[in-house]
Amino acid sequence: QGRCKLAQDMEVRVADMHDQAGKKSCTKLVLSPGSADAWLVEPDWAQPHVFTPGRYPAPVGSRYSGRYQFAKHYFPVLAGLLDGGEEFACAQLIDRHPAVRHWVRNLDTAPCGFGLPTSRGRFFADFVAELVDGRVAVLEYKGAHLLNNPYEIEKRQVGTLWAQGSQGRAIFGWLAMQRDGLGLAQQLDVVLA
């Protein structure tokens, strides 16, 4: 039994060291754009991520089946969205927003989902929208309990950096039910303005 405990402790320690190394590398290579060996975290308009009609592999068990009919979702089905709840409310607001032409419930797998690099691999925001003015909006909804989580903060930093490198063609929104004294609809208005 002593060997099992030692092996478990070593496994936990190695995992912690791996996470620390990932965070350090991410900070150096991704979140420090001025350094000589930093990665470029900006949209590649020469090879953009394209949502192709008919290419949205939403597993049958994860498809939205609620009563609300989304009018602007790019695909006829939605994946990973439960009827009711905070993300559902966010999706409804995106769907009804006058600045949104089309939107997608982003898949959390490549190559069909849009992702950005993080210390733990890739981050797939909740929603991607094409706006009526031609800009691309990448939107991430967070529950209040996650707003101060270090990994979630890293995602926000990466998304913000990505949008800043877009020459105004893309925006990144970090949304919550209440944030900085604004409700969800108000936050969405500010982000999409």
Annotate each language-model stretch with its function.
Residues 1-121, 129-135, 142-193:
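Intrinsically disordered, low-complexity, repeat-rich regions
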